[in-house]
């Protein structure tokens, strides 16, 4: 077993690239480290970063093809070696690089015989092809083939829902994921209570961006997700008439009361003292100070009433609900 030595900072949190290579036009690899981290931090960051790398980074794909030469999705065209389905699959694999917003409509227009590759796609200036040699189709006879394309920038997956044969237009399954794979591993070092961790992150991309660019993009997206939590005060949102309204769930204290009353007679509640509920000492003392001595006293208070009590928190309401659920 070969052990690799990596120099890491022992005081200031730092990251560095320890390996970077280009295996092909459509396969880049990078390995990065972040250290020093306290125990548990490496796993937290590694899981979040891997998910952000695979799901939060945008990519550009061909999402639709249209041609008068294409009669049906799975048919064969005279003068073309590949079936329509094979051509659509080849278009699906074309790797594009762009920062575009919205959609663009490039096209292919070629006269046979000959090979059609990604080089034959006429693109707008804002879009680049990563590998011009990617195969699309083979024309075996002197025919003209023109295909209109639609490209979009998005994230995740976009699965075609239906085929529109009437206008000879066909949706293409798109995978807007420039990061093909991402792994993380953790190395611990130090003695006793002084143990620290090094986080290793491995990234493979399709060539539309480098692993270093992917790491930066994923980090920025994670930061943007957490920015709202940095505001000290909770914001009030006002919905327009045409926006969807969502009812936020509240702790079902009232529902628990209704359920309990259905199971038992309310008269019995006044004979069940909170001493019998096996409450944590702090919750028990808070209730006693507020003159809540029986289960009936407790259930006659709303969730809001309980939270207003001194030293009584929302977590205590949750705890009470759990205890009542078991009774």
Curated annotation (Swiss-Prot):
Keywords, sorted A to Z: Chloroplast, DNA-directed RNA polymerase, Nucleotidyltransferase, Plastid, Transcription, Transferase
Tagged with keyword Chloroplast: yes
Domain of life: Eukaryota
EC primary class: transferase
Paired cysteines (S-S): none
Gene Ontology terms: biological process: DNA-templated transcription
Gene3D superfamilies attached to this UniProt entry: 5' to 3' exonuclease, C-terminal subdomain, DNA-directed RNA polymerase, insert domain, RNA polymerase, RBP11-like subunit
Subcellular location as annotated: Plastid, Chloroplast
Region annotation Alpha C-terminal domain (alpha-CTD): where it falls in the sequence: 264-327
Catalytic activity: RNA(n) + a ribonucleoside 5'-triphosphate = RNA(n+1) + diphosphate
One term under GO cellular component: mitochondrion
Primary localization: plastid
MF (Gene Ontology): DNA binding; DNA-directed RNA polymerase activity; protein dimerization activity
Alphabetical list of CDD domains matching this protein: RNAP_alpha_NTD
InterPro entries to which the protein is assigned, alphabetical: DNA-dir_RNA_pol_insert, DNA-dir_RNA_pol_RpoA/D/Rpb3, DNA-dir_RpoA, RBP11-like, RNAP_asu_C, RNApol_insert_sf
Region entry Alpha N-terminal domain (alpha-NTD), spans: 1-233
Enzyme Commission identifier(s): 2.7.7.6
Domain characteristics, as noted in the entry: The N-terminal domain is essential for RNAP assembly and basal transcription, whereas the C-terminal domain is involved in interaction with transcriptional regulators and with upstream promoter elements.
Family listed: Belongs to the RNA polymerase alpha chain family.
Entries under NCBIfam families matching the protein: rpoA (TIGR02027)
Assembly information from the UniProt record: The minimal PEP RNA polymerase found in etioplasts (PEP-B) is composed of four subunits: alpha, beta, beta', and beta''. Following differentiation into chloroplasts the PEP-A RNA polymerase in this organism has been shown to be composed of at least 13 subunits, including the PEP-B subunits. When a (nuclear-encoded) sigma factor is associated with the core the holoenzyme is formed, which can initiate transcription.
Functional note: DNA-dependent RNA polymerase catalyzes the transcription of DNA into RNA using the four ribonucleoside triphosphates as substrates.
Protein name listed in UniProt: DNA-directed RNA polymerase subunit alpha
Species for this entry: Sinapis alba (White mustard)
